[in-house]
């Protein structure tokens, strides 16, 4: 297996121009495909997950052109739901941001489409979304294991009263929200359980509004969506920088700055993961906010005990930053780590122990006490981009670290290690 050994990094300083947000890129691509008119997306992320969405849209007959660096996409909207000519199978890798929204959108009208992906995708639950779509009339068949992809979709979603469990993934609700305006009837979506990762729902609602559709949000407990609507292209749309990707550089500055400035997000960003900067500030770093940047300067870091449900992806970065904080850090309410690219609670606990931390892994929390000195370790990445990027921070100690399968960052940030080297 390929590996990358990072030598100890004495100091970080500089500016990082962030790649586009994965969450925003894939939502914007799908809405642009469903909309009337031509949309030009700029600062689009070029990564595996986005390529899976683009390939699926092409297979569904959507016409688009990409710039040479794949960050500008001109897409001709379909002016309504997407249809395949005959039976079709779409391979979506391990891209949840493609699998979940497409599973819903392709239930409009009549289709015969199979959605499948990598082995890990077949372990990521989708039953709550399927249950909700079936309530709205969709005909969906599990082709292997009940509640998991691959799925056969045969259309039929018309709207109506739909319940969805919000406790596992906000992507199920996102998928329903983006699809419901195109259904023939009105849809009332009721949330069962506690809704996780609420800020990701705000990204969805924000983008839908940009494409001309507003819905009634009743305190995140119920959403009322008028049927028979259509999305309208905004003309051009700039994809924000990826706030989850920003977390590694901001944390590096908190540990070994200097000052690092990330551009492409700022105080008005729609992504909840910008709140990661508040957590670093609470730990002792100095944060400065601009309209299109966030900067972080080193501070004496102290442990925290916090509910991280609002920033589940960026919270992983706090788990490795905790290795450099005084005291025991506890991250709570993060059960949904278990249903991401890998079981991130198990993976994080396992790899933190390798570098010498004392770790308690709970059902939905992790407690981390750093060692006096970090051990050298070979870090397994579980084909999870965030594991690779999080554990690069170990090199900010006086100990090298080896990252196995470093290219797994291609899911969201193909040139991550080059960017880290630029500020080191």
Curated annotation (Swiss-Prot):
Keyword tRNA processing in annotation: no
Catalytic activity: 3-phosphoshikimate + phosphoenolpyruvate = 5-O-(1-carboxyvinyl)-3-phosphoshikimate + phosphate
Chain sites annotated for binding 3-phosphoshikimate: 22-23, 27, 169-171, 197, 313, 336, 340
One example of a Gene Ontology biological process annotation: chorismate biosynthetic process
Gene3D superfamilies: Enolpyruvate transferase domain
This protein's GO CC annotations: cytoplasm
Entries under Pfam families matching the protein: EPSP_synthase (PF00275)
Keywords from the UniProt entry: Amino-acid biosynthesis, Aromatic amino acid biosynthesis, Cytoplasm, Transferase
Binding site for phosphoenolpyruvate: 22, 96, 124, 171, 344, 386, 411
Active site: 313 (proton acceptor)
Any GO molecular function: 3-phosphoshikimate 1-carboxyvinyltransferase activity
Top EC class of this enzyme: transferase
Pathways involved: Metabolic intermediate biosynthesis; chorismate biosynthesis; chorismate from D-erythrose 4-phosphate and phosphoenolpyruvate: step 6/7
Subcellular location: Cytoplasm
EC number: 2.5.1.19
Function: Catalyzes the transfer of the enolpyruvyl moiety of phosphoenolpyruvate (PEP) to the 5-hydroxyl of shikimate-3-phosphate (S3P) to produce enolpyruvyl shikimate-3-phosphate and inorganic phosphate.
Assembly mode: Monomer.
Family designation: Belongs to the EPSP synthase family.
Entry protein name: 3-phosphoshikimate 1-carboxyvinyltransferase
Origin organism lineage: Bacteria, Pseudomonadati, Pseudomonadota, Gammaproteobacteria, Enterobacterales
């Amino acid at each position: 297996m390929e590996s990358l050994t990072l030598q100890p990094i004495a100091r970080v300083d500089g500016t990082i121009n962030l790649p586009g947000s994965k969450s925003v890129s894939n939502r914007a691509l799908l809405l642009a495909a469903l909309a009337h008119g031509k949309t030009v997306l700029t600062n689009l992320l070029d990564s595996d997950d986005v390529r899976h969405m683009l390939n699926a849209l092409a297979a569904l007959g959507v016409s688009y052109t990409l710039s040479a660096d794949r960050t500008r996409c001109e897409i001709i909207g379909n002016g309504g739901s997407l249809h395949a000519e005959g039976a079709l199978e779409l391979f979506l890798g391990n891209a949840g941001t493609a699998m979940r929204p497409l599973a819903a959108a392709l239930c409009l009208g009549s289709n015969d489409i199979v959605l499948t992906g990598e082995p890990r995708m077949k372990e990521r639950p989708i039953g709550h979304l399927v249950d909700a779509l079936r309530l709205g009339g969709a005909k969906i068949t599990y082709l292997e294991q009940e509640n998991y992809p691959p799925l056969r979709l045969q259309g039929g979603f018309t709207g109506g009263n739909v319940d969805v469990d919000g406790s596992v993934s906000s992507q199920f609700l996102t998928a329903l929200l983006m699809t419901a305006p195109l259904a023939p009837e009105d849809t009332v979506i009721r949330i069962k359980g506690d809704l996780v990762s609420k800020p990701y729902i705000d990204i969805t609602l924000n983008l839908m509004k940009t494409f001309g559709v507003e819905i009634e949000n009743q305190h995140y407990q119920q959403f009322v969506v008028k049927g028979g609507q259509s999305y309208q292209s905004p003309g051009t749309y700039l994809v924000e920088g990826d706030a989850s990707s920003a977390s590694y550089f901001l944390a590096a500055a908190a540990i070994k700055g200097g000052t690092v400035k990330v551009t492409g997000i700022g105080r008005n960003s729609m992504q909840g993961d910008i709140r990661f900067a508040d957590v670093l500030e609470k730990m002792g770093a100095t944060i400065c906010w601009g309209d299109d940047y966030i900067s972080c300067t080193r501070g004496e870091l102290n442990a925290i005990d916090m509910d991280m449900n609002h920033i589940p992806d960026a919270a992983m970065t706090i788990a490795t930053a905790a290795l450099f904080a005084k005291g025991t850090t506890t991250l709570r309410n993060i059960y949904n780590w278990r249903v991401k690219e890998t079981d991130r609670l198990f993976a994080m606990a396992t790899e933190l122990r390798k570098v010498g931390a004392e770790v308690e892994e709970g059902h939905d929390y992790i407690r981390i006490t750093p060692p006096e000195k970090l051990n050298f370790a070979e870090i397994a990445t579980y084909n999870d981009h965030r594991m690779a990027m999080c554990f690069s921070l170990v090199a900010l100690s006086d100990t090298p670290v080896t990252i196995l399968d470093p290219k797994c960052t291609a899911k969201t940030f193909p040139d991550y290690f080059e960017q880290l080297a630029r500020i080191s």
